């Protein structure tokens, strides 16, 4: 019996061994297959890159013309000067393509679909995917051809014609033509599309028509930013977005979308349709990119990290490559050798960095708020100790703001004196407006006995915002004003803005060397979805803005902007808080990071060829 058991046991073991050998052979075969697939994919990728390089050579006119000397290759044609800086970087001895560039956003991005997104974060992503007709040199600020190879402007300034380059394609391989440029304007201007902000911005354009390779923008009247508006308009592929204009239903499908993003830029979405809020934002190199220089990084990634401390931890752990520090952090981090040995610090005023403000909503749910009274708004500015905010919270890495215009440029009125913290002056203004402490409880009330009490809404997760608002709460109570901090997530905040459902809100506007305040201060922009979300209306201001916008002569335009600044200074629809320095750390493996006149050389708000790269020996995410 024991012998029979041993025989059965031997048969069983033999059978099991045969199965194990079969499994091992299958795994070996599968591994060989995967290895073969990986090799095949590498060859396909290599061929795709070679084809893209060949396409670029054809575009340059360098193919079949014999070898190109090093001296000749370093001189780009005039219409390719937008790529000169990236081309120079690509000639560095240690230049290499590859690696990933990973950044973070302090809020969750609600949508990446063009024209639906009104925030800086989505725009930051879109500019790597969607091209524009022109771009700007970050050092000289000169406008340069990008998708357009040239342009002409009529003598009266009302007509601008761009000539689109030949042979350009979108990331899906379909051709980019002047018709796509014209379509992009018609698409956003269609009332079925939920793009009131962009329609406002492009409202001066009366028509955009294509003719062969030419596309002509016609303006209703002279406008000082006409060239910039036309040249920086996002170019969308008609074959991809056109179907959303077919009916109200398809337009609503577009309006509800969050990830419809396809363009001709140096990067593309992994899928141009599937991204959803909360997903990792991941772009991959567009191997069909038409530019003189291809994108250096294989992937461009943004993580949503909504808590400041968590962002810092992620940066220290190497999870993100570029980190914008808070002032207190920056002061400590630049003295930490463990940080500076692996990351390079940059400290600068970005002219496009804009300003932080508190906006006072003047009409809520159809009723006037206390902030409809100019004296109340001015009192709140006197109660806002902005210099203390700069000194104690921002550690001196900021300037107190007294208006929307860049104090380092010509647009700001140099004769306006910034209001200082003054509780007595604030109390006097509140009393003039009818707010006094009627029952001696330390809180001022209106004539109807209603306390002056409100909430300031601001983005949650930001320690700086939190510290500022908590400081203001303590300062306001000195004059008997009650304020409750109201931190909310970014999507909730955007909804509150669109519905004008807040008392006061603290946010920031991006800036430039010269800006147009029509979008957020003109009475016409109080419409639903418009950026005058505080319902501020002033016919005098409207007229000044309109006159400044149509004045093409800079010497005559600046005095008009000074009048706009003076009126805003008097009216205080916003309490302008401060303009921060950009305090940035960049991983030291990333080369050619520079501070230029326009800020860090990443392109900012413009589509611009990437100049950064990582030498092959230092690449972290190579395949």
Which residue ranges define each predicted feature?
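Detector for C-terminal structural segments
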Residues: 15-24, 60-72, 77, 81-85, ...
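Aromatic- and charge-enriched surface segment that lines or borders ligand/interaction sites
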Residues: 43-50, 149-194, 213-218, 311-314, ...
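N-terminal lobe/hinge region of extracytoplasmic solute-binding protein
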Residues: 85-87, 99-155, 186, 262-266
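Surface-exposed binding/hinge segments that line
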Residues: 94, 163, 198-247
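A structural "hinge/loop" feature
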Residues: 107-123, 147, 174, 226-236, ...
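Gly/Pro-rich hinge or "lid" segments in bacterial periplasmic/extracellular proteins
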Residues: 124, 131-142, 234-294, 299, ...
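Extracellular/periplasmic solute-recognition and catalytic clefts
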Residues: 188, 207, 270-282, 303-367, ...
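Ligand-site clamp/hinge motif
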Residues: 255-256, 287-334, 474, 482-484, ...
């Amino acid at each position: 019996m024991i012998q029979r058991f041993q025989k059965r046991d031997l048969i069983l073991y033999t059978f099991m061994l045969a199965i194990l050998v079969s499994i091992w052979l299958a795994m070996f075969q599968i591994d060989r297959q995967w290895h073969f697939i990986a090799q095949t994919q590498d060859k396909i990728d290599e061929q795709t890159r070679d084809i893209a390089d060949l396409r670029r050579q054809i575009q340059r006119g360098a193919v079949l013309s014999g070898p190109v000397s090093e001296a000749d290759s370093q001189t780009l044609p005039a219409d390719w000067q937008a790529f000169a800086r990236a081309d120079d970087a690509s000639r560095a001895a240690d230049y290499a393509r590859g690696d990933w560039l990973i950044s973070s956003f302090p809020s969750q991005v609600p949508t990446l679909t063009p024209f639906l997104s009104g925030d800086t974060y989505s725009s930051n992503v879109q500019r790597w995917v969607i091209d524009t007709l022109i771009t700007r040199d970050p050092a000289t600020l000169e406008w340069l051809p990008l998708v357009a190879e040239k342009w002409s402007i009529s003598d009266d300034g009302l007509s601008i014609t761009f000539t689109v380059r030949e042979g350009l394609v979108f990331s899906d391989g379909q051709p980019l033509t002047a018709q796509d440029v014209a379509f992009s304007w018609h698409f956003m201007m269609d009332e079925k599309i939920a793009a009131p902000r962009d329609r406002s911005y492009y409202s001066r354009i009366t028509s955009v028509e294509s003719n062969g390779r030419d596309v002509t923008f016609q303006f209703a009247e002279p406008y000082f930013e006409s060239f910039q508006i036309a040249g920086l308009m996002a170019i969308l592929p008609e074959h991809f977005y056109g179907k959303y204009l077919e009916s109200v239903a398809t337009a609503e499908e577009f309006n509800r979308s969050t990830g419809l993003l396809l363009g001709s830029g140096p990067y593309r979405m992994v899928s141009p349709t599937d991204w959803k809020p909360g997903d990792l934002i991941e772009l991959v190199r567009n191997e069909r990119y038409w530019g003189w220089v291809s994108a250096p990084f294989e992937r461009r990634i943004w993580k949503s990290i909504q808590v400041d401390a968590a962002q810092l931890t992620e940066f220290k752990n190497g999870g993100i490559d570029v980190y914008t520090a808070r002032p207190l952090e920056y002061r400590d981090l630049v003295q930490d050798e463990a940080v500076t040995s692996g990351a390079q610090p940059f400290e600068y005023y970005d002219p496009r960095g804009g300003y932080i403000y508190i906006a006072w909503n003047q009409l809520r749910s159809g009723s006037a708020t206390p902030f409809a009274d100019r004296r109340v708004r001015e009192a709140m500015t006197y109660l806002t100790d902005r210099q203390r905010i700069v000194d104690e919270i921002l550690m001196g890495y900021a300037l107190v703001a007294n208006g929307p215009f860049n104090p380092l440029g010509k647009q700001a009125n140099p004769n306006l004196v910034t209001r200082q913290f003054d509780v007595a002056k604030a109390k006097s203004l509140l009393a003039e407006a009818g707010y006094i402490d009627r029952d001696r409880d330390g809180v001022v009330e209106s004539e109807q006995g209603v306390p002056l009490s409100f909430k300031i809404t601001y983005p949650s997760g930001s320690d700086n915002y939190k510290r500022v608002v908590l400081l203001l709460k303590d300062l306001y109570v000195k004059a008997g004003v009650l304020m409750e901090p109201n931190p909310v997530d970014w999507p909730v905040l955007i909804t509150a803005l669109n519905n004008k459902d807040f008392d006061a809100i603290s946010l920031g506007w991006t800036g430039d060397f010269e800006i147009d305040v029509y979008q957020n201060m003109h009475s016409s922009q109080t419409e639903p979805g418009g950026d005058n979300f505080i319902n501020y209306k002033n016919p005098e201001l409207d007229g000044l803005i309109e006159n400044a916008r149509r004045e093409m002569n800079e010497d005559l335009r600046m005095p008009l902007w000074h009048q706009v600044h003076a009126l805003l200074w008097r009216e205080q629809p916003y309490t302008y808080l401060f303009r921060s320095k950009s305090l940035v750390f960049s991983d030291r493996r990333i080369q050619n990071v520079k501070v230029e006149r326009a800020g860090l050389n990443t392109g900012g708000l413009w589509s611009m060829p990437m100049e950064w790269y990582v030498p092959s020996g230092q690449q972290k995410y190579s395949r």
